[in-house]
Amino acid sequence: MLPDHFSPLSGDIKLSVLALVVLVVLAQTAPDGWIRRCYYGTGRCRKSCKEIERKKEKCGEKHICCVPKEKDKLSHIHDQKETSELYI
C-alpha cells in the first residue's frame, strides 16, 4: 500500500530547491549580475570602466577595479584640500 502523504524530508528539499531557484533568478535579473566587488566593497571588477568611474586596482589578470567617482574617498579628500587652501 502506498502512503497518502509525502515524507517531511521531501517537502524540505522542495523548499530548498525553490529558494535556490529564486536566488539565482534574482541574481541574474540584477543590473550587475554576478560581478565581483573590490576596493573595500565600493568598486566592481570590470573589463573597462564606465565614464563615471575611476580605475583603482587590478582584479585578476583581465579585469580592473572601477570605483564610482562619488564614492572615491581619495578624490573627496583632494577636493577638500584644494578648497581649504583657498580660504587661507
Swiss-Prot record:
It is found in: Secreted. GO terms for cellular component: extracellular region. One of its GO terms (biological process) is defense response to Gram-negative bacterium. Keywords: Antibiotic, Antimicrobial, Defensin, Disulfide bond, Secreted, Signal. InterPro entries: Beta-defensin, Beta_defensin_dom. Disulfide bonds join C38-C65, C45-C59, C49-C66. The keyword Lipid biosynthesis does not apply. Residues 1-27 form the signal peptide. Its main location: secreted. Belongs to the beta-defensin family. Has antibacterial activity. This is Beta-defensin 115. It comes from Homo sapiens (Human). The gene is DEFB115.
